Amino acid sequence: VCPPTLVQLALQRCADVRPDLAAYDANRRLLYRELTQMGYECIPPQGAFYLFVRVPDGDDVAFSQRAKLEHDLLVVPSTAFHCPGFLRLSYCVSHDMILRSLPAFRAIREKYQ
């Protein structure tokens, strides 16, 4: 099965594009440092572009819903990846997006203390 022609044309233009690994590394270090300083337990990434963060009460689905409803923060519960009790946060986003997410993570964490 071949991908549609439009997809093939788009991929052809992207063939030489390389990810900005230095930016991803900076985001990883920032997110890990800030979340652990807030009191979150994080599993250090070992080559992936996402960070697993343990939710304080173990209910990753409820945490994700609360983050969206109370702080307009979209996070992925790791139950979707057969790893309940964690969030799976991708850090291959803009540095600004990481910075804008931190106050919400801080506010949510404070509610658990």
Regions found by a protein language model. Name each.
Residues 1-113:
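PLP-dependent class I/II
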